[in-house]
Amino acid sequence: MTAHSFALPVIIFTTFWGLIGIAGPWFVPKGPNRGVIITMLVATAVCCYLFWLIAILAQLNPLFGPQLKNETIWYVRFLWE
């Protein structure tokens, strides 16, 4: 269940930002700044995708867990039983 719940957002966001970065430049009108607009569009798609990917991967495998004192652990255990 976890692999499926992780794979679906990755596929959706990869497709979304891929379409913006690859298909978006096709719709930029011709003009003197066309190259700049295409560069900005592709750079924005890449940066937003990488920001999202790094954030989701950091949540998937955190470097450290919550730091609890022994008293807190015993109190939570007492309340949950």
UniProtKB/Swiss-Prot annotation:
Glycans are attached at N70. Residues 29-35 are cytoplasmic. It holds the Pfam family ATP_synt_H. One of its GO terms (biological process) is proton transmembrane transport. Expressed in brain (at protein level). It is found in: Membrane; Cytoplasmic vesicle, Clathrin-coated vesicle membrane; Cytoplasmic vesicle, Secretory vesicle, Synaptic vesicle membrane. The chain crosses the membrane at residues 8-28, 36-56. InterPro entries: ATPase_V0-cplx_e1/e2_su, ATPase_V0-cplx_e1/e2_su_met. GO terms for molecular function: proton-transporting ATPase activity, rotational mechanism. Its main location: membrane. Keywords: Cytoplasmic vesicle, Glycoprotein, Hydrogen ion transport, Ion transport, Membrane, Synapse, Transmembrane, Transmembrane helix, Transport. It comes from the Eukaryota. It is a multi-pass membrane protein. One of its GO terms (cellular component) is synaptic vesicle membrane. V-ATPase is a heteromultimeric enzyme made up of two complexes: the ATP-hydrolytic V1 complex and the proton translocation V0 complex. The V1 complex consists of three catalytic AB heterodimers that form a heterohexamer, three peripheral stalks each consisting of EG heterodimers, one central rotor including subunits D and F, and the regulatory subunits C and H. The proton translocation complex V0 consists of the proton transport subunit a, a ring of proteolipid subunits c9c'', rotary subunit d, subunits e and f, and the accessory subunits ATP6AP1/Ac45 and ATP6AP2/PRR. PANTHER family: V-TYPE PROTON ATPASE SUBUNIT E 2, VACUOLAR ATP SYNTHASE SUBUNIT H. Subunit of the V0 complex of vacuolar(H+)-ATPase (V-ATPase), a multisubunit enzyme composed of a peripheral complex (V1) that hydrolyzes ATP and a membrane integral complex (V0) that translocates protons. V-ATPase is responsible for acidifying and maintaining the pH of intracellular compartments and in some cell types, is targeted to the plasma membrane, where it is responsible for acidifying the extracellular environment. This is V-type proton ATPase subunit e 2. It comes from Rattus norvegicus (Rat). The lineage of its organism: Eukaryota, Metazoa, Chordata, Craniata, Vertebrata.
